[in-house]
Every structure is written in structure tokens, then in C-alpha cells.
Amino acid sequence: MKKLLKSALLFAATGSALSLQALPVGNPAEPSLLIDGTMWEGASGDPCDPCATWCDAISIRAGYYGDYVFDRVLKVDVNKTFSGMAATPTQATGNASNTNQPEANGRPNIAYGRHMQDAEWFSNAAFLALNIWDRFDIFCTLGASNGYFKASSAAFNLVGLIGFSAASSISTDLPMQLPNVGITQGVVEFYTDTSFSWSVGARGALWECGCATLGAEFQYAQSNPKIEMLNVTSSPAQFVIHKPRGYKGASSNFPLPITAGTTEATDTKSATIKYHEWQVGLALSYRLNMLVPYIGVNWSRATFDADTIRIAQPKLKSEILNITTWNPSLIGSTTALPNNSGKDVLSDVLQIASIQINKMKSRKACGVAVGATLIDADKWSITGEARLINERAAHMNAQFRF
């Protein structure tokens, strides 16, 4: 039985690490692996020892913590209906009508049920653990994190106004108009800046038998990075914004101010992503001399919330050649449209385009982790871990005991 357990753990730790897939599970035996210190000699870890004192019971470890999520499985968290837009134009010819009146009961939300195509999250931090009786760890990390996210434009409610009869991009009645189409055939991606992040957690050995250890852990992590670069690519509208700002709360309701997207826009907020994640895990390890492979399962929930900030397409504050954006003419020429006394110059161009950064959350909660810890002189250790199913991630931890 011992040989079978050794083989299974060693195969999982080495074989799965070749296909690296939020928070690491960690080695369940980690609290009891480093029993000697680089500065102070280790003491008995037995609470039943009559000679033991509280000074013997407590030790401190420090080191490096690196966690790299290459593909987190996320979905957008939105309502089934989307309100504030005008009716979708359906007529074959002419112009859109009633674009200043919202649909009575809203419309089906094109973002509902959408999945993220790619979600990456990288963290580098300092690690500090308080150990009790060589059985339990209370630890924290302090460092920096940054991310990258990509999805269909439908997942972020890219909308605009098409078919509106106007000769000027800053027509006096344009500020009262509402977007009437949602753009689904496009891609939205954004990068966050590198921002301060932290986490806290606890890990303990629940059961030990010979060289085998069964342990559990709990962690919570948080960070608030800002969007550094937003890139929107679609046929009707394409734009890139460095350090985007937008509208939150009541100010994000349609219609947006006519100055939205210009340098004169007011009441805008930074696009900050509020990242929160918690996790519980259970893992089994088996010590093979200096190598301690392990396998575990975790249950985690992560959210990335930007307060549904709405960001307008950048545009000029005054017209140049009757336009304020570089959006293309969708039919290539306005000569095929009714002239309407020259008011249909812009009716085939997407106007007042904007995008909403919707809340994202975990689509799969359960995951599997495999890894191994290499120990040197019971004072130093290096741990490598790979995670699968709910994310593809790799983790590295190097630490020493004082």
C-alpha cells in the first residue's frame, strides 16, 4: 500500500507539472517540514512534552511566493435584461426612429451567460508564516499583482447608435439619443497595471501516519489594480484607451453626456478592478526523503468587479470633416441613403459608442492541485505546484525557517 501511495503521488507531481494549468493549495505537510532554524535551533514540536514551552511552540518562516494563473475559467455576472437602450432598428430602408425613447421592458442582455476567452493573473510576493507546534501555520503574503482579460464584445455590452438622421456629430438633438444596437462580433481585451496585493491564510496537518500527511488550508486574497490599457476591436468601432476613465452608478445611465469620450468629460472615475478570492483546500502528501510530493483538491471563488463602469469611445470635442470618431461608414457611401435635406450624412456610422466592464466571477469552483516540495537540511524548502480544471496555473514557493 505504501509503495502504491508513493508511486501515485510521485507520478501526479511530476507528470501533471508538464502541463501547467488563483490561489495555491500548498503542501499539507509544510508546517512540519522545516523543523530546524537557520538562526535558532529547532525545539520539540510535541505539545505533550512536559519540558516544552511556548517559546518552543512558535517559529517563523519567510520566503518568496509566486503564483501565475495562465487561464482562469470565468464568466460575466450580469442580469438577464439590459435597460436604457432604444429599440433595435428593423426597417429595411430609411432611418431609425424613436431613438430618444428607451424600450419599455428593456431587452435581453447580450452579455448574459457569456464566458471569458482568456483570464490571466500573476502575483509575486513576500511570504511570512507563523508556525505553532510544527503542526499549524498562519501566514500572509504582501506583494504585487497584474492581469489580462479577453472576451467577446458581447460580454462587455459594446453598444452604439446607428441610423440616426443627422448632419452633424454634435447635433443639438444628439445628446438626447440612446444607443440602439449591441455589437456582438468583436473582441475586447484589457490589461491591468501592477498593483499592491495581499493574502492571509491558515494551513494545518489534520492526520499523520508514518510519512503520510493529510492537511487542510484556507486563504483569502485581495487586490485593486486599475485598467492600464483597453482595446476594443469590431467592424463598426475600433479604439484603444490608455488608462481609461468612465461613468459609474447613476451617471452611467443612458444617455451619456455628449462630452463623454472627449477631453472635456467630467464626473468620470478610474477603471479599477476589485479582485477578491477565497479558497479552502484538502491535500495528501507522502515524504520520500528530501522530496515530498502531494496532491489536493480546492474549492475557490474569485470575483473581478469594476462597478460596471461604462467607458465611452474616445472622440474629438469638435468636428473635423463632420466627424468626431474614426468609425467607418458601414455601407461605404451615403449616396444610397435618402438625402433628407442633408441630414443623413452620419446615419450609416456608429455613434455614441461605449462599453461596460461587467463583473466577472468563477465559472468552475472545484480544482485539482499537484506539486512537490524539496527540502534541504530541514531549514530550507522549495515548492512547485500545478493546478487544473478551474484554472491552469503554476505556483512556486521558496522559504526558510529562522
Curated annotation (Swiss-Prot):
Domain of life (superkingdom): Bacteria
Pfam family, one: Chlam_OMP
GO terms under cellular component: cell outer membrane; pore complex
Keyword annotations from UniProtKB, A to Z: Cell outer membrane, Cell shape, Disulfide bond, Ion transport, Membrane, Porin, Signal, Transmembrane, Transmembrane beta strand, Transport
GO BP terms, alphabetized: monoatomic ion transport; regulation of cell shape
Signal peptide region: 1-22
Localization annotation: Cell outer membrane
Keyword GTP-binding belongs to the record: no
Membrane topology summary: Multi-pass membrane protein
Alphabetized GO MF terms: porin activity; structural molecule activity
Transmembrane segments: none
Known role: In elementary bodies (EBs, the infectious stage, which is able to survive outside the host cell) provides the structural integrity of the outer envelope through disulfide cross-links with the small cysteine-rich protein and the large cysteine-rich periplasmic protein. It has been described in publications as the Sarkosyl-insoluble COMC (Chlamydia outer membrane complex), and serves as the functional equivalent of peptidoglycan. It is present but some of the disulfide bonds are reduced in reticulate bodies (RBs). Permits diffusion of specific solutes through the outer membrane.
Family: Belongs to the chlamydial porin (CP) (TC 1.B.2) family.
Quaternary organization: Part of a disulfide cross-linked outer membrane complex (COMC) composed of the major outer membrane porin (MOMP), the small cysteine-rich protein (OmcA) and the large cysteine-rich periplasmic protein (OmcB).
The name this protein goes by in its record: Major outer membrane porin
Gene encoding the protein: ompA
